[in-house]
Curated annotation (Swiss-Prot):
Keywords: Acyltransferase, Amino-acid biosynthesis, Cytoplasm, Methionine biosynthesis, Transferase. This is Homoserine O-succinyltransferase. The gene is metXS. It comes from Teredinibacter turnerae (strain ATCC 39867 / T7901). Substrate binds at R227, D358. GO terms for cellular component: cytoplasm. Residues 51-361 form the AB hydrolase-1 domain.
Amino acid sequence: MPDSIPANSVGLVTPQLMQFDEPLALACGRTLDSYQLMVETYGTLNASRTNALLICHALSGHHHAAGYHSMDERKPGWWDAYIGPGKPLDTNKFFIVSLNNIGGCHGSTGPVTPNPSTGQPWGGDFPTLRVRDWVHSQARLADALGIQKWAAVVGGSLGGMQAMRWSLEYPDRVGHCVVIASAMKLSAQNIAFNHAAREAILTDPDFHDGNFLSHSTVPKRGLSTARVIAHLTYLSDDGMGQKFGRELRSGSFEQGTEEPVEFQIESYLRYQADSFSKVFDANTYVLMTRALDYFDLAREYGDDPVEAFKQAQCKYMVISFTSDWRFSPERSREIVNALIRADRDVVYGELESDFGHDAFLIPNQPRYWDLLTSYMSQIEVAD
């Protein structure tokens, strides 16, 4: 818990649960008759409603992007290092909106919330989702908040995919699109990692086809293993070497010692997986990794990303990190090259980092801070 709230923090924040009663037709062919979104906002919406900025979260993210829910909260929101007064996403300038997407497990309608037709948690019966479903629900959220056009839509990883989809689905409602550590579609290797993670969950005896809550069980082992698989892809070899090397947590290699040896990296992964399995839902993990796999920005444009980006009207900023092998700089360059060929305005930054894919979340990176600050400061908003 903080001893006091830092001066550059958004401070204590209260999430709000927003109700939407207009049916939402999903890409899978099913419909949500109604749904709820858990939302947090930071800063003040100006009189002209031109300073609104949307944050789209990644796979394990949620609405709590900045500030504290109480003085007892141990850590601030997941992107607190970059959101707040005087920070790159400056709340003195922007009205920032962050939400937990449909299918999430932090308050929005999803597998852990009641299915209106049964009164029981949706569980494994929750509809399959696509990135465009999230974008359409976010557009409804913008309408409810009285926001006709976002000054910017910002997202990292899966959030970057949402930002790009926004620029195509609602081209006249996005001023700037900030895409960080993302891609226009997953590689076969990325799909394989997601498959391995899902298999760990789906084959856990406690999963019960996604209806584990009705069996009073939790597929903790499967979800923990899935998290370990994913977490490995978020780190880099250099980063793990610098942080953990071959240091031991317990045990010894001394001759005559039979005690099991545990490396620091093993202990770290086990701790992270155990923590994750206590706060995340297995069905949500399955839903969101499938949405990742199914995303293909150019599919409906003849598999031509140039043709896809010709639909857009906004300006773009694309950022990648050299040690990110999950969403490598090559994937970001593909986005940039397509934007250039589509004659769209784009700024690209490729940053040196040892933090792997997680770099977009890590604080205390001066070049990342400066790049974001420089771009965001140039976004014009009316008084």
